[in-house]
A protein has these predicted regions:
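Active-site-adjacent betaalpha module
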Residues: 1-85
């Protein structure tokens, strides 16, 4: 699935979670702009809806509002068991 959004947080993950035929062995990959706003918000919403799913954030496919903010967002995601690759 590719989700094209126009704002930072979305609850589309809830309906997708119910309708997706993704088993827990499948990896969900995330990326986007801004790491510290959009990406981290959606990663944490995704984690809430799919607590046992393997989720990866591609750090080189993201950009933050600053280098420090980008790094901080990656640390937050990592602390919530989102693998940073």
């Amino acid at each position: 699935y590719v989700v094209d959004k126009d704002t930072f947080g979305t609850f589309i993950w809830g309906s997708m979670s119910v309708n997706m035929s993704v088993d827990e062995d499948t990896t969900i990959e995330i990326c986007g702009v801004c790491t510290d706003i959009c990406v981290v918000s959606n990663a944490l919403i995704m984690r809430a809806f799919r607590p046992n799913q393997k989720i990866e954030c591609h750090k080189d496919w993201c950009a933050g509002t600053s280098v420090a903010a980008h790094e901080a967002a990656l640390k937050v995601m990592e602390s919530c068991q989102i693998e940073i690759v």
